[in-house]
Amino acid sequence: MFKFNDEKGQLKCSFCGKTQDQVRKLVAGPGVYICDECIELCTEIVEEELGNEEEFEFKDIPKPKEIREILDEYVIGQDEAKKSLAVAVYNHYKRINSGSKIDDVELSKSNILMIGPTGSGKTLLAQTLARILNVPFAIADATSLTEAGYVGEDVENILLKLIQAADYDVERAEKGIIYIDEIDKIARKSENPSITRDVSGEGVQQALLKILEGTIASVPPQGGRKHPHQEFIQIDTTNILFICGGAFDGLEPIIKRRLGKKVIGFGADIQQSDVDEKNLLSKVLPEDLLKFGLIPEFVGRLPVITTLEPLDEQALVDILTKPKNAIVKQYQKMLELDGVELEFEEEALREIAKKAIERKTGARGLRSIIEGIMLDVMFELPSREDVQKCIITVETVRGNKPPKLIRHDGTVIEQERKTSA
């Protein structure tokens, strides 16, 4: 419908209402007019939108050494694992930039399997890699997955988490990273194929095969089970990097048997056995994973295998104090906001590390131990103006004495130890 000014009979812009005399140009369309000013405004809006949604690509992929250096800022130890991950991730995104083919040579996808004990840094490494590359990242727990049609989560729900992490920008999600934890829990119950249905073990491995390799998956936007009458989000998993991690308890005896070392036997060199046992996981081969219960096709889609070592006492002490996000630094900053200086004695840090080793929780257990120690401190000190410094001693960690509190004049505040009723 043409818009005219009733008084002068002039044409008007259908968007802003300005007349032909008020603008430089008026462009006619079927039933509408648009002025040059509105065209310019629309162009700016479209360019801004396209700028946000332009093809997601990595112009400057950090080199493996650069990736390793950034990982060092957040993750203590695990040097071999960092090196393997840095190379694998660099090659993966270089492959994406090249379009998967260079001079008719097809570059295959390199998903990663991380094997290491609880609390050794598997999840943190994957999270930090995603942060370095600024790509969407999602964590999934393999234990909640079941084969399609059974109670539990479908494997497509993993992809939904990644899409949500990318704010439903599917193109960005298609170049993200998914970390699947507890992957060892979906091993089949025995090395031999089962004649009965294993819906949470081998069945899940079979269901994961396609998305690991690369496929166009249909994902329900609201999650949950699929049904025929709902809409789906289509996502190509070809360029999604999958990192699978697990503790793989029971894998070491399998490696020992392959290497010809007896698990139990007379005349064995016990000292040599202890030395070898520390590095057994680093000698893992695909055939060991097959014996553990992963199916051949699944192992074949995880070509990069890297192992993490159990963290020793010194590594745990370093984790408490050295990374940018170290737990001790966080508590020091929190108390600094209340005008109190927090100090942990070296022996106190070592005692915390020993407790984590005893609990066999690795780095993951450090926070819960420190939170237990710091609860009363964080409760009391914000209300006290006479405290300038708080020192956590080894006796505090052991539960024998309260922390040492120092006044502004440097004198120690005498405290009575709280006894449990």
Curated annotation (Swiss-Prot):
The alphabetical list of record keywords is: ATP-binding, Chaperone, Metal-binding, Nucleotide-binding, Zinc
Cellular component (GO) terms are:
HslUV protease complex
Q: Which Gene3D superfamilies match?
A: 1.10.8.60, ClpX chaperone, C4-type zinc finger domain (6.20.220.10), P-loop containing nucleotide triphosphate hydrolases (3.40.50.300)
Listed binding positions for ATP are 117-124
Q: Name one GO molecular function term.
A: protein dimerization activity
User: The ClpX-type ZB domain covers which part of the protein?
Assistant: 1-54
Recorded hits in SUPFAM superfamilies, A to Z, give: Glucocorticoid receptor-like (DNA-binding domain), P-loop containing nucleoside triphosphate hydrolases
Where, in this chain's numbering, is Zn(2+) bound?
A: 13, 16, 35, 38
GO BP: any one term: proteolysis involved in protein catabolic process
InterPro entries per the UniProt record, alphabetical: AAA+_ATPase, ATP-dep_Clp_protease_ClpX, ATPase_AAA_core, Clp_ATPase_C, Clp_protease_ATP-bd_su_ClpX, ClpX_bact, P-loop_NTPase, Znf_CppX_C4
Protein family (similarity comment): Belongs to the ClpX chaperone family.
What this protein is reported to do is described as: ATP-dependent specificity component of the Clp protease. It directs the protease to specific substrates. Can perform chaperone functions in the absence of ClpP.
Quaternary assembly: Component of the ClpX-ClpP complex. Forms a hexameric ring that, in the presence of ATP, binds to fourteen ClpP subunits assembled into a disk-like structure with a central cavity, resembling the structure of eukaryotic proteasomes.
Annotated protein name in UniProt = ATP-dependent Clp protease ATP-binding subunit ClpX
Q: Which organism is it from?
A: Geobacillus sp. (strain WCH70)
Source organism phylogeny = Bacteria, Bacillati, Bacillota, Bacilli, Bacillales
The gene from which this protein is expressed is: clpX
